[in-house]
Amino acid sequence: MAHREGTWEQVNRAIRERLRVRLKRDPQPSAGVVDSQSVKTTAVGGEDRGYDGGKKVKGRKRHLLVDTQGLLLKAKVHSAKVMDYEGIKTLLRRADETFPRLPHLWLDAGYRGEDKGAHWVEKTLGWSVDLVERQRKPAPKEVF
């Protein structure tokens, strides 16, 4: 049964909506966060294995869309060589149909730029985007 297309998405949706109701939230999210993570894989890879030059990782990359509670809305896994601005397009394809109440996203600064993900989200989906800058680590305090 779990091998059928869309089964895990349906299970995840049912659990997520119940949790959101328990948290006194609307079952459908109104904002989300997108991020990616590159993960090392073992020695022999398949088609979905590649090298992420920015993070210096050989393996796979996952793009995640979560709600403001951190609950998974959608995930895509592909080769680590896929650039973030291309991965977000794959992740969010038809997301406006799946999540009609989701007009706003937070993205990290890696999605900034005319040809990058933030511009594509605004132009294609009509959603607003806030770019979140990486927090700088405070300088270590000198001890005398």
Could you describe each region identified by the protein language model?
Residues 1-144:
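Short alpha-helical elements
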